[in-house]
């Protein structure tokens, strides 16, 4: 009784994928007895007529995978009740998994062995969700080829392959011919249904307040003249006289806030690796500046620089906008220096301006903002808001989408209650997820690789919401 196995024949030289065993009967042997043969990656079996009497004519060859077999001895393979007769010996016979070969390419982004492994992994994952073996084999090679075509380096190939394998599991193999998730047809394609779903995602007043949003126009307390002029530096936490903010000093700080390292079990600064327990100079700060900076959080303090505006009196039709701002430290605190607004329905940027701050510039935060220079002709916040706070753009009926929108609305000096904040919708435990991580996890998109781009961030936050509502990201007509 022969074991039940799958058998595939490849007429060209190929890598042998894994170790298998099968029973083989040499039809030219007078003894007609069966012989069990092992085939592994580093060895194969050929039949050499000159050695027919030795080991029944079978000779093991090592490390010769790419050389074609030239012997012409014919043989018969009995496998269960199926008989394969008169197979030329140059054929490589494999059993177990089918032959999985990547599509040949002139310029391969990764070594051939890596591509073979990826095809195998795709096939293995697809078998969990689909039963049609020929379809799975074809899909595995096609999807791997799609990954290889867009990859420029070995690293990008591995990254894109991991995304594909993740999507196969996430969508249970329900991907299109390019390896992308299939768009589910639903009523969400209708604009009215999309609006209904978007309204269900709006944050309530309690959630807004808990996450730092100003939910109404608060009464501003009169500024106490006897109040101390000393404030805490936002970067190094040193107390300093805000009236002397432009006077040169030494501000040592870390570019990134400390986080807990699970391996070292210490709170460390990811910008330089220094920990709170270290006593080196770098532990005090890996960056040095000539001025301290501050950031008002109080409604009254913020209003003393630029008054807030409520959108209650700004009439207009209901629209959906995604926005993001870039900020800088100035002598007047934390000010907006760029604003980008994107239309949800068309995915087009409808407003994008560099804003001239009211205070004297101390730090443009160029590493994060991407702004290195602001021209004197750039509009101020008072001039710019006449363009973006209007019936045709941001009005009382606008649904605003963004990530960490409390910061954006604060520097824009806007009080609004129709807000969808991806930082709140997708928390990371007791903390908020970064837009960079959200974009990677949900959109399989890498952003903020270097300097931030407000248009890139606004579109990413918008696409996260579209993905949540199963809206095709390329849909621009409604």
UniProtKB/Swiss-Prot annotation:
Provide the alphabetized UniProt keywords. Cytoplasm, Exonuclease, Hydrolase, Nuclease, Nucleus, rRNA processing
Q: Which SUPFAM superfamilies match?
A: Ribonuclease H-like
Exonuclease domain ranges (all copies): 320-465
Query: Which terms in the Gene Ontology molecular function aspect does this entry carry?
Result: exonuclease activity; nucleic acid binding
Chief subcellular location equals cytoplasm
Instruction: State its Enzyme Commission number(s).
Output: 3.1.-.-
GO terms classed as biological process: rRNA processing
InterPro entries (UniProt xref): Exonuclease_RNaseT/DNA_pol3, REX1-like_exo, REXO1/3/4-like, RNaseH-like_sf, RNaseH_sf
- Leading EC class: hydrolase
Q: Which GO terms describe its cellular component?
A: cytoplasm; nucleus
rRNA processing among keywords: yes
Provide the protein's localization: Cytoplasm; Nucleus
Q: Which PANTHER family match?
A: RNA EXONUCLEASE 3 (PTHR12801:SF118), RNA EXONUCLEASE REXO1 / RECO3 FAMILY MEMBER-RELATED (PTHR12801)
Describe the task this protein carries out: 3' to 5' exoribonuclease required for proper 3' end maturation of MRP RNA and of the U5L snRNA.
Which family does the entry's similarity section mention? Belongs to the REXO1/REXO3 family.
What protein name applies here? RNA exonuclease 3
Q: Gene name, please? A: REX3
